[in-house]
């Protein structure tokens, strides 16, 4: 229905989850995320095609098979980019990216360019690439005010990242 209301402009993005603890509430481990993601993405495709959903009387109405051409996949890995490319989906890149062990200051483009290259190499002939990179914009009256507003959340996030085993260099908001 939303695609009808937007006159065919709906784009839909999916990702397997960003942190290992994201899966625990669903009774899954992080290691199971790839298979679970593939299964659920297949279910979405089936629903959009109008296939039955667990019972002959259960179908998505109205069916929306056109949405399969407007899927975006979020990934941190070249393997995920290859799967997205092979399926002809768009590639979503994050504003941040886990750094390889021992390289906490590796620039974002050094991590994401190989992901983009893998995606482009995997696209079927004739399929136009679709790549987006999310970025954060924080608007404030001054740099000092922006830091003051952001500091509590950034400190909390840094604490959570450290607890999850990530290396966070520095101890100030500007680090």
What are these regions (language model features)?
Residues 1-175:
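Active-site-adjacent structural elements that line small-molecule/cofactor binding pockets in enzymes
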């Amino acid at each position: 229905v939303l695609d009808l209301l937007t006159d065919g402009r709906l784009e839909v993005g999916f990702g397997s989850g960003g942190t290992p603890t994201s899966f625990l509430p669903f009774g899954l481990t992080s290691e199971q995320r790839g298979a679970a993601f593939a299964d659920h993405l297949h279910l979405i495709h089936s629903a959009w095609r109008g296939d039955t959903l667990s019972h002959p009387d259960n179908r998505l109405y109205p069916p929306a098979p056109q949405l399969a051409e407007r899927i975006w996949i979020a990934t941190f890995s070249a393997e995920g980019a290859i799967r997205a490319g092979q399926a002809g989906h768009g590639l979503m890149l994050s504003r941040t990216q886990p750094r390889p062990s021992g390289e906490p200051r590796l620039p974002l483009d050094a991590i994401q360019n190989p992901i983009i290259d893998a995606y482009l190499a995997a696209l079927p002939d004739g399929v136009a690439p679709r790549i987006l990179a999310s970025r954060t914009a924080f608007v404030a009256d001054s740099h000092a005010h922006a830091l003051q507003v952001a500091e509590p959340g950034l400190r909390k996030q840094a604490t959570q990242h450290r607890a999850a085993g990530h290396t966070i260099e520095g101890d100030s908001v500007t680090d």
